[in-house]
Regions:
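Conserved donor NDP-sugar-binding/catalytic core segment of glycosyltransferases
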Residues: 104-140
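A conserved acidic beta->alpha catalytic loop
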Residues: 24, 39-48, 69, 99
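A short, conserved alpha-helix in the catalytic core of glycosyltransferases
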Residues: 168-187, 191-217
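Active-site donor/metal-binding and catalytic loop motifs
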Residues: 210, 214-230
Length: 308
């Protein structure tokens, strides 16, 4: 089966990484039919580079979309997928500007897909993701539902001993979407801006079919450490509460709000976690905004803002 695939990459101020990544797609054993780069208003020369890159031709169609402002990963992938759907591609492959594809990443995905039975039950596929330490298990997860809450369980080493296995959640690093899936579920929620957009989209994908992780199709994505910028946590908290409310019964959202409040807003957060008053206030606002659907870029907590 010969399938056409459009690659979508979102970039923001990582020109050095982007150059390396784009070269790797030229080296694929199965070439994409097109590659779309969404530039989230980078300020490091990305605009000029992409204008030259797309005019130089290559082994597939090149397209650069320059946003006038930073739309976050959620907004970037949303407009990238929307543009890809204007073509006649059968699949859309999503990844980051600093995620390096092995030369046969697409070949392996299609090789296993073509051998699978009941292909109509498969909504998306995804790669294994490695970092500098080995397999990065957090990129692929399972969901377990309890009476009041859900648990996300990261994949484990034993899962990767099989040629492929099913997952419930994927990140947008090495995700291969069927065109028919996007036609059914629409685009990622651009109003999430950053964080939880991939989990929310995965949940919609799973409502239409399986997500299959192919273990010998490999992306390498560096682990960036555990340090979190405090302004980002506003979006993490807000979007998680909103996501749970969208896809699970009300009691799950109530539990999610309570859990976030205890960990990030309560006396426990102040005394045990040493969270500042501003940090706790930010998360209180995030919980409320998630509940009522006040999404988009917050006027109070814009990217890069110091919280204190």
């Amino acid at each position: 089966m010969n399938s056409s695939v459009c690659v979508v990459i979102v970039t923001y101020n990582r020109l050095t990484d982007l150059k390396i990544t784009l070269e790797k797609y030229e080296e694929q054993t199965i070439k994409p039919t097109s590659l779309i780069v969404v530039d989230n208003a980078s300020r490091d020369g990305t605009y000029e580079f992409l204008e030259e890159w797309k005019s130089n031709g290559g082994k597939f169609r090149r397209l650069a979309i320059h946003s006038e402002k930073n739309l976050g990963g959620a907004g970037g992938f949303s407009i990238g997928i929307e543009e890809a759907m204007k073509s006649d591609c059968d699949f859309i492959f999503l990844s980051d500007d600093d995620a390096i594809p092995k030369e046969d990443v697409l070949e392996k995905l299609f090789q296993h897909y073509n051998q699978m039975h009941l292909q109509e039950n498969i909504a998306a596929l995804c790669t294994r993701v490695n970092d500098q330490f080995g397999i990065s298990y957090v990129h692929r997860s399972m969901v377990r539902k309890g009476l009041f809450s859900i648990r996300r369980i990261s994949t484990q080493e034993k899962d990767y001993e099989a040629p492929y296995f099913d997952v419930d959640l994927l990140t947008f690093v090495g995700a291969l979407l069927k065109r028919s899936t996007v036609e059914r579920i629409g685009l990622p929620l651009s109003e999430y801006f950053i964080h939880e957009d991939d989990a929310e989209y995965s949940t919609r994908i799973r409502e239409t079919g399986r997500i299959v992780c192919v273990t010998d199709s490999i992306m390498t994505h560096p682990f960036g450490g555990n340090e979190t910028k405090h302004w980002i946590e506003y979006y993490t908290t807000r979007n998680y509460v909103n996501y749970i409310g969208r896809h699970y019964p009300r009691r799950y959202q109530v539990y999610a709000e309570l859990e976030k409040y205890i960990k990030k807003c309560s006396i426990f957060a102040a005394v045990v976690k040493h969270r500042s008053k501003n940090y706790r206030r930010m998360n209180k606002i995030a919980i409320k905004d998630g509940r009522v659907g006040n999404l988009g870029i917050s006027e109070l907590y814009k990217p890069g803002q110091e919280i204190g």
